[in-house]
Structure formats: structure tokens, C-alpha cells
């Protein structure tokens, strides 16, 4: 008899979790509190239902080839970066293609998820749900929580003295949908993440003035990179990841800063990272131009509000502010769990590989999508779901929970004492995390093996963008179309741009032509290092750290 799995949420991660359950012959039942799929990608005119939704002008930050499900590429005519409507259409196509809708119970709220009395033997859960005022109870063999981390708006009013005296409008970005209603107003946006940048840029076209306040600053990335190719596809490559492991981090950071400042000087634009703060990045194509045109004014952090003004850290005062928009993120919670599980699941240090809670005797509960990645969250959550369903089925194993819990508790104590830094909120390197989870499943691509069997494919896998299809080339869940998807990914990237063909126009050399000149030596070196132990790689990197940085910097400067 197939194991019954409860999937909480029918957003991006919920849909992939349903499909992965079906792929492993499990029996999923998905509970979705709204009336449709897509989660935050389903646009609504308001957020009165308490659910976080996208604002109307939102455009994806990760290109289509990097943010698709691994066995379901976007149509070639889809734009590389798309609005929320196009992306939701893709989710709908995915759900219909794999016949997932029949597993979803809409307008159903999960009230509680509790361990059954015999949990230590069975690993089963009691799940109580409510639909149209009627409660239902069911027993499940496993649970996948796919509610994401955009749940509760974080509105830190207590951190801003005088905010309660302010007579203007105060709102969180969750409430922002369209720029209408802000015409002629002076708007202060607090927080500079992707959302803060987007809202500030959009309001700069209608508001009288937009002030953008940031404590830390940020590096601003554009969606397009060299030769106009999508930025994600140019930097998220195994060859780049290999180089990053060998070359000194100081040198790599210097190169990155030099490249980003080449577009515009971040310090001159008031965007440079505050000294002592961690570097962070946002994707925004228009912010520099808006600052250059004076439509957006960069400000330091706010230290105090009055009835109509804001006082900033640098001593400046901005008068006659009409609206304050907090783009200060979200907090996540699991109200349907009991303590101590409820609190433990909010601490990422107590989640094995950011997925499995460590305090459970049986690995029958998984938190999907509670992770920050330097890349596509969609492909990351899909790979998590593939791993989790195989653990549920007994095909993959995880270490004993007692040992993991002990190690995590010790690490937490060391963090509190200042011995270790708390990195739980840091974003994970995309390729490293994906490879880690793929290795647990048995789907991590073997570069040496690919090079021996299929050199052309190996070349694309190592030097090309690390698209999700790479994790369908081998092992469980292998997809016969993965090879072709990888070899044609640039065709799908360029197809939506080919709307005006100029006869006999000169075509710039592609990146692959340049790679061929230096790729073979790097590939050979990487193959040798891959065959060696990671200890050897670490030794090489450590030796190079201090010795190479001054030389490389001086060489680069000429």
C-alpha cells in the first residue's frame, strides 16, 4: 500500500513536491488555503486574505533556463525574464501536464499537525484541516511543508523612535500592488532588497519624490551581462565554481567589485556597502538611472520620525513625507505545529541540510523551500522534494537524529559564545548546495564520466550554465530529454529575441568561442583535482590565498 503524504501549500515548491510523490509511487494530498495554485505568484488586487502576493509590475530576477523545473523547460518563445502572469502560466502548464490538480484540496486551511502516539514506531502524523467551516482529521505517513518563508510581514516599528507620531501613511510592501494612489506624494522606502528597489523605481514615475533608505547598501546587478546574455547563465557555471575554490577569495572579490563598479560607481551613487557589513546583491536594471536623474534620492538609515519628517543617521532631515513603505522582509512560522517542534523548525541550524528537523525519531517531516540560494529557489526546492520523497520511501538514508541534534546544539552554543559566526541567514552557493543534495539522491553529474562518454555534453555541463537539467542526466529520476535540453538551452534563450532578423549582419563571437581557447587546460586541471581528495583541493587553495593575491591584483592593474 502506498504511503500517504500530506503536502502543505500548492505554490512553486508544493507543485514539485506533489509531482515527486507521484514519481515515487507515494500518495499525495495537497492542502491549499487559497482557491488556486501558484502561492505568491498568483496576483490579486489586495492582500486582504493575509497571503503574500506579487505586486503587479514584478519581473523575475532569474532567467527562464535557470528557473524551470528540471524535466519541464519553458517554451522557447517565453521571454528570458517574465512578468508574474507569464510565470504563473508556466506553473499552470506544469500542473496540467503532469495532472497534479487532482491531488489538491483548495480553500483548505491546515489547523494542526501532531505526532501520533505511536510515532516512534510508525512515524505517522495526525493532520487536522478546515474547509468551509468544517474540520477534518486524517492520518498521514509523512508531511511536506511547502509554505515558504514569505509568510508574516516584518514591520519593525519599535526600531524607529517617533514612528507613532507620524501622521502620514505607513504600510508594508506586502500591501503594495500598483503605483496609482501615490501621485504627487513624497514617499520614503525603507529597506533596499529586490522589493525595495523595484517599488522605489516604479514609484519614481508617479510620486513627486522617492527617498530610498538603506543601512548597509548593496551591489546592483543587471539582468543582462556580457554580450547581452542573461546574467545568471553567465556566472552560474561549474568552471566558475571551480575557479572560486582555487583562487584567493580576496582576489575574486576585488575582480567582482571592479566589474560591478565598471557599470557605475556604487559609492558615487550612495549604494556602496557600509564598512563592516556583509556584501549583498539585488537585481535592478533601472535603479542607477533613477538615481542619476534625481527621481530617487539615496538616504542613510532613519533614526527618528516626527509628525511629518524623517531624521537620518547622517544628520539630514527630509520634510513633508506623505508615505512610508517598509520593505523589511518577512518572518516565517509554523502555527500548525506544537512546541518544541514549532520553535525548532524556525532555526535553520536544526534542519538537516535545511530540510529535515533534527529532533524527530523518524524522518517523516520535511520543510521544503526554507532556504536562501544564490540562484533559483524553484530548482532548489524541486531537488529537495526529489530527495525527501526518496527518504520517505526508504531509498535514501539520513544520519541518526540524536547525533545530528547533538552536533547542532553544540554549534548553537559556540555561536552564542562568539566562537562561530551565525551563517544561518546567509545565502548558500547555488551549485554547491544543489550538488550536495544531488549527491544524496545519486543524481550529481560526474564530469569525468561525462567527458569519457559524451565530450560535447561534458563541455556544456562544465563550461555552460548549470541549468536544472543537469540533475536529470543520470541516477534516479533520469530524464531522456535532459541531454537535448542542455544542448539547446542557448537556442531557447535567443529565440524570443529573434523578432527582427537583419540580413548579413555581423554576429559577435559567442562565449563558447572564447572558452575553447583556454577551456581545455582548465578542464584538464579540474578533472585532476576532482579525482583527488577534497583535502588536496583545500591545501592548494590555502597555499594560494596569501601568495597569489598581491601578484594577481598587480598583474590585473597592469
Swiss-Prot record:
It is a single-pass membrane protein. It is found in: Microsome membrane; Endoplasmic reticulum membrane. Its EC number is 1.14.13.8. Liver. It catalyses: N,N-dimethylaniline + NADPH + O2 + H(+) = N,N-dimethylaniline N-oxide + NADP(+) + H2O. SUPFAM superfamilies: FAD/NAD(P)-binding domain. The chain crosses the membrane at residues 517-537. It is an enzyme of class 1 (oxidoreductase). Keywords: Endoplasmic reticulum, FAD, Flavoprotein, Membrane, Microsome, Monooxygenase, NADP, Oxidoreductase, Transmembrane, Transmembrane helix. GO terms for cellular component: endoplasmic reticulum membrane. NADP(+) binds at residues 60-61, 195-198. Its main location: membrane. It comes from the Eukaryota. Gene3D superfamilies: FAD/NAD(P)-binding domain. InterPro entries: FAD/NAD-bd_sf, Flavin_mOase, Flavin_mOase-like, Flavin_mOase_4, FMO-like. GO terms for molecular function: flavin adenine dinucleotide binding; N,N-dimethylaniline monooxygenase activity; NADP binding. This protein is involved in the oxidative metabolism of a variety of xenobiotics such as drugs and pesticides. Belongs to the FMO family. This is Dimethylaniline monooxygenase [N-oxide-forming] 4. It comes from Homo sapiens (Human). The gene is FMO4.
Amino acid at each position: 500500500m502506498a504511503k500517504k503524504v500530506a503536502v502543505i501549500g500548492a505554490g512553486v515548491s508544493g507543485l514539485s513536491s506533489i509531482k515527486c510523490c507521484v514519481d515515487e509511487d507515494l500518495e499525495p494530498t495537497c492542502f491549499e488555503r487559497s482557491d488556486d495554485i501558484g502561492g505568491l505568484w498568483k496576483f490579486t488586487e489586495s492582500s486582504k486574505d493575509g497571503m503574500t502576493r506579487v505586486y503587479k509590475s514584478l519581473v523575475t530576477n532569474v532567467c527562464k533556463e535557470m528557473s524551470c523545473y528540471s524535466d519541464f523547460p519553458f517554451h522557447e518563445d517565453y521571454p528570458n525574464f517574465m512578468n508574474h502572469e507569464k510565470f504563473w502560466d508556466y506553473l499552470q502548464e506544469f500542473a496540467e501536464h503532469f495532472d497534479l490538480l487532482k491531488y489538491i484540496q483548495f480553500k483548505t486551511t491546515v489547523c494542526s499537525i501532531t505526532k501520533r502516539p505511536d510515532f516512534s514506531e510508525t512515524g505517522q502524523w495526525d493532520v487536522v484541516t478546515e474547509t468551509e467551516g468544517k474540520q477534518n482529521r486524517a492520518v498521514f505517513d509523512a508531511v511536506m511543508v511547502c509554505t515558504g518563508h514569505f509568510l508574516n510581514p516584518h514591520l519593525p516599528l519599535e526600531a524607529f523612535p517617533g514612528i507613532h507620531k507620524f501622521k502620514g501613511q505607513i504600510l508594508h510592501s506586502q500591501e503594495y500592488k500598483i503605483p496609482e494612489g501615490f501621485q504627487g506624494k513624497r514617499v520614503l522606502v525603507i529597506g533596499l532588497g529586490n522589493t525595495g528597489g523595484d517599488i522605489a523605481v516604479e514609484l519614481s514615475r508617479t510620486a513627486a519624490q522617492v527617498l530610498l533608505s538603506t543601512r548597509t547598501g548593496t551591489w546592483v546587478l543587471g539582468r543582462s551581462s556580457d554580450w547581452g546574455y542573461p546574467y545568471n547563465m553567465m556566472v552560474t557555471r561549474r568552471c566558475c565554481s571551480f575557479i572560486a575554490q582555487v583562487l584567493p577569495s580576496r582576489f575574486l572579490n576585488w575582480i567582482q567589485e571592479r566589474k560591478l563598479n565598471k557599470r557605475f560607481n556604487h559609492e558615487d551613487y550612495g549604494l556602496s556597502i557600509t564598512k563592516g557589513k556583509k556584501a549583498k546583491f539585488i537585481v535592478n536594471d533601472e535603479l542607477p538611472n533613477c538615481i542619476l536623474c534625481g527621481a530617487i534620492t539615496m538616504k542613510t538609515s532613519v533614526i527618528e520620525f516626527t509628525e511629518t519628517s524623517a531624521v537620518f543617521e547622517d544628520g539630514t532631515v527630509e520634510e513633508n513625507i506623505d508615505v512610508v513603505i517598509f520593505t523589511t522582509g518577512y518572518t516565517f512560522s509554523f502555527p500548525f505545529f506544537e512546541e518544541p517542534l514549532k520553535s525548532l523548525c524556525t532555526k535553520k541550524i536544526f534542519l538537516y541540510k535545511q530540510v529535515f528537523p533534527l529532533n524527530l525519531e523518524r524522518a517523516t517531516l520535511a520543510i521544503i523551500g526554507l532556504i536562501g540560494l544564490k540562484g533559483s529557489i524553484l530548482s532548489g526546492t524541486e531537488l529537495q522534494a526529489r530527495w525527501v520523497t526518496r527518504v520517505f520511501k526508504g531509498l535514501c538514508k539520513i544520519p541518526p537524529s540524536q547525533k545530528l541534534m547533538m552536533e547542532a546544539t553544540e554549534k548553537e552554543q559556540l555561536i552564542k559564545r562568539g566562537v562561530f559566526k551565525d551563517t544561518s541567514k546567509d545565502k548558500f552557493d547555488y551549485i554547491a548546495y544543489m550538488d550536495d543534495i544531488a549527491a544524496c539522491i545519486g543524481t550529481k553529474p560526474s564530469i569525468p564520466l561525462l567527458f569519457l562518454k559524451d565530450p560535447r555534453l561534458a563541455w556544456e555541463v562544465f563550461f555552460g550554465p548549470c541549468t536544472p537539467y543537469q540533475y536529470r542526466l543520470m541516477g534516479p529520476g533520469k530524464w531522456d530529454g535532459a541531454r537535448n535540453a542542455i544542448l539547446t538551452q542557448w537556442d531557447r534563450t535567443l529565440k524570443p529575441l529573434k523578432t527582427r532578423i537583419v540580413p548579413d549582419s555581423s554576429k559577435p563571437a559567442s562565449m563558447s568561442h572564447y572558452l575553447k581557447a583556454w577551456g581545455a587546460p582548465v578542464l584538464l586541471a579540474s578533472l585532476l583535482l576532482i579525482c583527488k581528495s577534497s583535502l588536496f583541493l583545500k591545501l592548494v587553495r590555502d597555499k594560494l590565498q596569501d601568495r597569489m593575491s598581491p601578484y594577481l591584483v598587480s598583474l590585473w592593474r597592469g
